[in-house]
């Protein structure tokens, strides 16, 4: 077995094969035990009190786990010692606190957000099969660009289509196969389809100008030096950084103001990922 340890922060990771990418950051009180491969991609953050027991755990790039209370993310649970206990997580996935049960494999796509206290359960009934109750152990598959609301439970055998929103406090008992849709309730049901608005270039430019105005207003509450920010769609220029808001690529130099803008913009669905992550290190006036 290969081992990664950080005694100062109580981080202990063991795996048969250990692949930790570049610029991966670990929090405190982390325990990960993987009997096969544990892999985490570049620029990922595994936060405090993250625990995992699995056969295989593959995490993509720019993964972010950041608990906001005394709990952490728990991966494993019943069946975690079996060879089917496999979890694959795509790129740019965000999660906080919650539980992913691995009685069967779980796959999570790219650009997925799991809100606080989301549980994924891959097994079924508590009651005995000798009494006639069903045996249920089934995979869970979550597509790309899915947001799962607070305190939602996703049950065994569920597949969730790409570009899906699941409302908070939902219980997902059956697959949600219609893409570009909002589901909610217990059990979760289709609420409505998502229609993507069509904006002209002029409207997009005006939207950028509005975003800039909001950011300038926010900065007026902070002790910051003079900075420059302007836009000509699809490009936004802030100090020495040039951002393409169509594909979220960038070039140039980062500073405290550009970091603050990226952190601000992600609240508008504009997520510009960089190796040092999202930061907002400004002082109020």
What are these regions (language model features)?
Residues 173-193:
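C-terminal, active-site-flanking charged/polar segments
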Residues 163-167, 173:
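Canonical bilayer-spanning transmembrane alpha-helix
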